[in-house]
Amino acid sequence: MTDVRKVAWEDVRLEELNPLISRRLIYSEAQMLAHVVLKKGAIVPAHDHVNEQFTYILSGALRFWIGEHADAPGDTYTDVHAGEVLVLPSMVRHRAEALEDTLDMDIFNPPRQDWLDGTDSYLRASK
C-alpha cells in the first residue's frame, strides 16, 4: 500500500541554491513538486533533462529561451506570467531569467535526481 502524506509548504526546508534562487521539494517515487523562489534578475542557465516539466507561475514572471535559443539568448523568447504554465517535454534545452521577484511551482516526472542528490551545479553556480 502506498504511503499517503499531507505536507505543508512551510514545514519543508527552504534550500538556498545561490543568493537569488531557493526552493522547497516534495517528491514521491514517480514525480516531484518544487516551489522555486527567484529574485528579480536570477538566471537559470541553459540546460536540459530527461524529466518532463510543467512550470506554473504563482507570482511574478519568467522569461524562457527554448531550444537553439537557450545557448544564445536573444530576441526569441517566451515570457510566462502569474497564472500561466509552460510545458517542457523531455530533453528540450531551456534557460530562464526572472523578470521580477517570482514564485513558481515546477512539476517533474520522474523526479529530478540531480536536485535530490545536490549535483545540480549548473543551478548552484548561477547568479
PLM regions: where:
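Short, conserved beta-strand element in jelly-roll/cupin
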Residues: 37-39, 49-64, 68
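A cytosolic small-molecule/anion-sensing beta-strand core signal
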Residues: 58-59, 81, 100
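Ligand-binding loop in jelly-roll beta-barrel domains
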Residues: 90-114
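Histidine-centered metal-chelating micro-motifs
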Residues: 43-45, 63, 85-95
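A short, N-terminal "cap"/entry segment at the start of jelly-roll beta-barrel domains
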Residues: 1-34, 121-127
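Short histidine-centered beta-strand/loop micro-motifs
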Residues: 17, 24-25, 36-37, 44-49, ...
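Short acidic-glycine-tyrosine-enriched beta hairpin
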Residues: 69-90
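Conserved hydrophobic/aromatic beta-strand scaffold that supports enzyme active sites
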Residues: 6, 25, 35-37, 54, ...
